[in-house]
UniProtKB/Swiss-Prot annotation:
Belongs to the glycosyltransferase 1 family. Bacterial/plant glycogen synthase subfamily. It catalyses: [(1->4)-alpha-D-glucosyl](n) + ADP-alpha-D-glucose = [(1->4)-alpha-D-glucosyl](n+1) + ADP + H(+). GO terms for molecular function: alpha-1,4-glucan glucosyltransferase (ADP-glucose donor) activity; alpha-1,4-glucan glucosyltransferase (UDP-glucose donor) activity. Pathway: Glycan biosynthesis; glycogen biosynthesis. It is an enzyme of class 2 (transferase). Its EC number is 2.4.1.21. This is Glycogen synthase. NCBIfam families: glgA, PRK00654.1-2. InterPro entries: Glyco_trans_1 (IPR001296), GS/SS (IPR011835), Starch_synth_cat_dom (IPR013534). HAMAP family: Glycogen_synth. SUPFAM superfamilies: UDP-Glycosyltransferase/glycogen phosphorylase. GO terms for biological process: glycogen biosynthetic process.
């Protein structure tokens, strides 16, 4: 039997998704599977899962998950996802909730307990299956306990002695930081409570443990891998990341172009391609009609923003510039949810500029596609952006982005006025810096239709495939001794 790469994640599209993590885990394991690598995914069984639609069925019952006070049990469900097994860890009181990590009151009080349970249950599932994976690939703080556990277990447990681990950081700002009293129930030995382990200013830090104990650490763009070793972007973990520089790699995310493909997109009223751009104009007209925006905006640029309404995504920079943008007679479309304060502000602006600005305080996949297709310019003023996927989608949909020049945005956008420009970037992440970059884009749209059309076509032809990323991840696995079939 071929060696197995097991992906552990709290989200996987189409089963669960709150952001880019779900997209990545819906694509990377499957891409490797199609390359001939034996892969599987383990993820929580959330209450909103559509079991009938995806053929999810119970495959293991009452798996014991050990704790200091005794075992509790988990059930495991399974689905066949294009020939690749996906396992779902089920325990109702932990995962049968409306949201994944928080509600409008804040983070769930038992998030540490929930995801410690998930990690330990995933390990118990492997024992029940009778196979230790060659590589366990963990993603973000929710699964970061697994590399720490396996580092210690494989020293005395022959079942795990050949398993190696990879820890991928999708967003360093979310670390899984909890009270020190919760450490005693996680299953790690006392020596893991140290500055070189999971201890972080007196707290229990799950992501720090994953970084400390994984055999390899990756993040989702080369620029972000460099940034997180600095105090500005390291979120307090720059020290341990610098110590682990030899094991740290930046691999740019890909895009699932089977889903984000304007030539063949079930969510669009009209398809189009670099050689058939008339369809994009029809998508714009349909978007204006759908959102109740003035038809006169067909003659003006429409700016689209899709993202969480939080400081990280720079929504406040957009809000601060709305009055100036309205003076330039542009349209603005906002899609996303986040802090109640920002939600209220964008809804107020929609009332103030009715017909010119539309804000939908939600996230729906179909509308996201139609905004990418119907907008002329895409806005992404992030204060930090590990990789970003929406700007990659915007490029493929021929909607040149205006984005801050950092992280994955720097790695994916060639800025104007370069001859091969695909968008616009800015270094001064402030309202003035953002507005200046927007006005560059608006001026080009207004005054040089030939240059704009050329940028649109170049953007659509840029390719960030998961195949490119998967080859780099496979190289990481092989550095750890993983030998794929046929080699």
């Amino acid at each position: 039997m071929q060696p197995l790469v097991l992906f552990a994640t709290s989200e996987m599209y189409p089963f669960s998704k709150s952001g880019g993590l779900g997209d990545v885990l819906g694509a990377l394991p499957l891409t490797l599977h199609r390359m001939g690598v034996r892969t599987a995914v383990v993820t929580p069984f959330y209450g909103r899962l559509k079991t009938a639609e995806y053929g999810i069925h119970l495959t293991m019952s009452d798996i014991p998950v050990g704790y200091p006070w005794g075992p509790i049990t988990a059930d495991v469900y399974e689905a066949d996802f294009h020939g690749m097994p996906v396992y779902f860890i089920s325990r109702g009181e932990y995962f049968d909730r409306r949201f994944y990590y928080n509600d409008y009151k804040g983070d769930y009080f038992d998030n540490c307990e929930r995801f410690v349970f998930f990690c330990r249950a995933a390990a118990s599932m492997c024992r029940r299956l009778g196979e230790a994976p060659a590589v366990v690939h963990a993603h973000d703080w929710q699964t970061a306990l697994l590399p720490a556990l396996l580092y210690h277990w494989r020293r005395y447990d022959s079942f795990w002695e050949d398993t190696r681990t990879v820890m991928t950081i999708h967003n360093l700002a979310f670390q899984g930081r909890f009270s020190s009293r919760l450490f005693e129930n996680c299953g790690l030995p006392p020596q893991a409570w140290s500055m070189d382990g999971v201890e972080f200013y007196g707290d229990f830090n799950l992501l720090k443990g994953g970084i400390a104990y994984a055999d390899k650490v990756t993040t989702v763009s080369p620029s972000y891998a460099r940034e997180i070793t600095t105090p500005e972007f390291g979120c307090g973990l720059e020290g341990i990341l610098r110590r682990r520089t030899h094991a740290l790699h930046g691999i740019l995310n890909g895009a699932d172009y089977d889903i984000w493909k304007p030539e063949d997109d079930r969510f669009l009223p009209c398809t189009y391609s670099p050689d058939r751009l008339a369809g994009k104009q029809r998508c714009k007209r349909a978007l204006l009609d759908e959102l109740g925006l003035d038809s006169s905006l067909m003659e003006r640029p429409v700016l689209g923003f899709i993202g969480r309404l939080r400081d990280q995504k720079g929504i406040d920079l957009l809000i601060d510039n709305i009055a100036q943008l309205m003076e330039r007679q542009v349209g603005v479309v906002i899609l996303g949810e986040g802090s109640l304060e920002y939600e209220a502000q964008v809804l107020h602006l929609m009332e103030e500029y009715k017909g010119r600005l539309c804000a939908r305080v939600e996230y729906t996949e179909d509308l996201a596609h139609r905004i990418q297709a119907g907008a002329d310019i895409f806005l992404m003023p992030s204060r930090y952006e590990p990789c970003g996927l929406t700007q990659i989608y915007a490029l493929r949909f021929g909607t040149p982005p205006v984005a801050s020049s950092l992280g994955g945005l720097r790695d994916t956008i060639t800025p104007w006025p370069a001859p091969d420009a695909t968008g616009f970037t800015f270094d001064d992440v402030s309202p003035a810096g953002f507005l200046n970059a927007i006005m560059q884009a608006v001026n080009l749209w207004e005054n040089d239709h030939t240059a704009w059309a050329g940028m649109v076509r170049r953007a659509m032809e840029v390719s960030f495939t998961w195949e490119k990323a998967a080859v780099q991840y496979l190289d990481i696995y092989q550095q750890l001794g993983f030998v794929p079939a046929g080699e």
